[in-house]
């Protein structure tokens, strides 16, 4: 029995180390393709202003490809347009979670942080969005997209936009 203790502790240590690293979601390529088709159909429905159909299609797409923050944002937008604010908030929070998870997988990609800023702003958490933006600017000072976003005061412009006000909470 005492011979198994070191093996047990080794196994626990290995499992702990393996569990600490962020992993990509287990989504098959078939699921991603099906979600892309659903999103395409939803975009067509949006162009026809059939928001109810678009919302249903986006809900199916996010169920298949739950790690795609952009799809969650689209779902939240449709739900706001349909007057389903609590459901929209859940979708926007899922978008934020997806963007945060993507940042953990690829911390050197500044665009993912800018998407988090957008999701925070949609949720009405503007102070958090500004704090994150300052942090991103410090982490990625040479990135042209970050520089343009900050120097162009795009967050402020976005917050003043009538369209953004329609879809934000």
Q: Where in the sequence are the language-model features?
A:
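Alpha-helical segment of the N-proximal tetratricopeptide repeat
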Residues: 31-60, 64
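Terminal, low-structured helical/coil segments at or just beyond the last alpha-helical repeat
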Residues: 25, 130-169
